[in-house]
Regions:
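Positively charged, low-complexity terminal tracts
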Residues: 1-111
C-alpha cells in the first residue's frame, strides 16, 4: 500500500549541510542569469536559505525535495562517468565527492 503522507523533514549533520549548501550555491551560479530556470532558481535559493538557518530539522517542500534528489542523482551519474574516463589523481578527487553524494542520497532520500 502506498503511503498517503510523506515526511519532508530532514536532519542533516554539519558536514551534510555544508556539502548541500555548496552544491545548491553552485547550481544557483550556473543557472542564475537564465530566465527559463525561474522555478529552479526559486527552489535552490530557498534551499540555501533553509540550509543556512540554525535549525536542527529542515522542512522541505515536495518540489524542493524532488529537485534536490534529482540533481544529486544526476551529479552522481555524471561523476561516475567522469571517473571512468579519468586518471588516478582525478579519480581520487572525484571518489570523495561521489561517496559524499551517495551517502546523502542513501541516508535521506531513499525509501
Amino acid at each position: 500500500m502506498k503511503k498517503l503522507f510523506t515526511n519532508y523533514n530532514f536532519e542533516f549533520n554539519k558536514n551534510e549541510k555544508k556539502i548541500l549548501k555548496t552544491f545548491c550555491s553552485q547550481n544557483l551560479k550556473q543557472i542564475q542569469n537564465e530566465n527559463k530556470y525561474f522555478a529552479e532558481i526559486k527552489i535552490f535559493s530557498s534551499l540555501v536559505e533553509k540550509l543556512n538557518s540554525s535549525e536542527e530539522v529542515i522542512k522541505l517542500t515536495k518540489d524542493e525535495r524532488n529537485r534536490l534528489k534529482l540533481q544529486l542523482q544526476e551529479n552522481v551519474n555524471y561523476l561516475k562517468k567522469k571517473m571512468a574516463k579519468s586518471w588516478f589523481l582525478k579519480k581520487l578527487l572525484y571518489k570523495s565527492m561521489l561517496t559524499q553524494y551517495e551517502n546523502i542520497l542513501s541516508n535521506h532520500f531513499e525509501g
